[in-house]
């Protein structure tokens, strides 16, 4: 994995983080994506899974669709996709099928990530065995504006962010699997917790000092 950055990458990632904050204000989870060509934004998007009631409406998927329409073609060679969070497996397959040349993200996703967990972004077998469908392995740049990306999630819900960190769901991209703190399964899913935490954010502000065991009382 390549870990480097320039002024353009930082500017584009700053926009992704800004979009993630917009998503949070609109009642979505804080994900934002930008697609650029030669340093110019071609498309951008936020998650709309809650608004649309559609689990496939990830920011990366929406941005890819918009970029393809703007470009007038399916394949996005020489384009860069930026996201505040490492794309999931679903989004990673779409990135490969769209032939995106470069992927840049801030926070890694070791449990669900299309690179760190499932290796889709680095799997050259896709393009070797099905070259008619999948593009070459993209360059991957990670860790851009890491602290700023973390702060956006922390601002969205401090208590949810603490739980996410404890479960090792979003981490610095270089973290090794052995360093991820795996939490035992709970009776209710992470999706349920995040949804409840978001809906009750006003109540949570007064509970931040309480132990995490009190999540079961929500």
Segments (PLM) and residue ranges:
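Zinc-dependent deaminase
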Residues: 1-23, 93-218
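Small-residue (primarily alanine) positions within well-ordered alpha-helices
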Residues: 16, 20-23, 33, 43, ...
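Short, flexible loop/turn motifs enriched in small residues
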Residues: 26-30
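Short beta-strand scaffold segments in enzyme catalytic cores
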Residues: 31-39
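Short beta->alpha transition motifs characteristic of CBS
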Residues: 42-49
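Residues that line or immediately flank small-molecule/substrate-binding pockets and catalytic motifs
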Residues: 49, 83, 107
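A short, polar/charged loop-to-alpha-helix boundary motif
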Residues: 51-61
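Helix-adjacent hinge/juxtasegments
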Residues: 65-102
């Amino acid at each position: 994995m390549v870990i480097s950055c320039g002024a353009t990458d930082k500017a584009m990632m700053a926009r992704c983080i800004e979009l993630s904050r917009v998503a949070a204000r609109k009642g979505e989870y804080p994900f934002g994506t930008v697609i650029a060509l030669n340093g110019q934004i071609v498309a951008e998007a936020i998650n709309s899974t809650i608004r649309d009631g559609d689990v496939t409406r990830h920011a990366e998927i929406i941005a890819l669709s918009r970029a393809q329409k703007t470009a007038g073609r399916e394949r996005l060679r020489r384009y860069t996709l930026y996201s505040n969070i490492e794309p999931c497996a679903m989004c990673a397959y779409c990135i490969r099928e769209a032939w995106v040349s470069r992927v840049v993200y801030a926070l890694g996703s070791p449990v669900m990530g299309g690179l760190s967990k499932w290796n889709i972004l680095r799997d050259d077998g896709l393009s070797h065995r099905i070259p008619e469908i999948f593009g070459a392995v993209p360059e991957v740049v990670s860790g851009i504006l890491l602290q700023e990306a973390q702060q956006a999630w922390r601002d969205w819900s401090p208590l949810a962010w603490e739980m996410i960190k404890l479960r090792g769901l979003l981490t610095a991209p270089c973290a090794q699997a052995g360093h991820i703190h795996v939490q035992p399964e709970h009776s209710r899913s992470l999706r349920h917790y995040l949804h409840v935490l978001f809906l009750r954010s006003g109540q949570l502000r007064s509970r931040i000092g309480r132990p995490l065991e009190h999540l079961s009382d929500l």
